[in-house]
């Protein structure tokens, strides 16, 4: 699976740009997540291990989003639309 940091979707002939904001992983009957901030900072969350806290993992370009702890695989990707200011 290829995970793009940005995707473009065409609606009625107009291109809309979306930026990756999160990846949900599943494996071993358990979900974990990575969250991506607007500045491309990546955080890891596992409610069982980290509780309410997140662990800093680095900048988006240096984190392998296709693989996660204990062999968990990506199950869902979340993107938000980038609104252009005029």
Language-model segments: what does each one mean?
Residues 13-86:
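Conserved catalytic-core surface of thiol
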């Amino acid at each position: 699976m290829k995970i793009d940091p940005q995707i473009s979707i065409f609606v009625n002939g107009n291109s809309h740009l979306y930026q990756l904001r999160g990846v949900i992983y599943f494996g071993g009957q358990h979900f974990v997540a990575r969250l991506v901030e607007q500045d491309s900072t990546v955080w890891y969350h596992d409610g069982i291990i980290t509780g309410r806290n997140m662990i800093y993992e680095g900048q988006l370009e240096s984190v392998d989003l296709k693989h996660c702890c204990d062999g968990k695989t990506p199950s869902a990707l979340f993107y938000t639309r980038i609104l252009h200011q005029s």
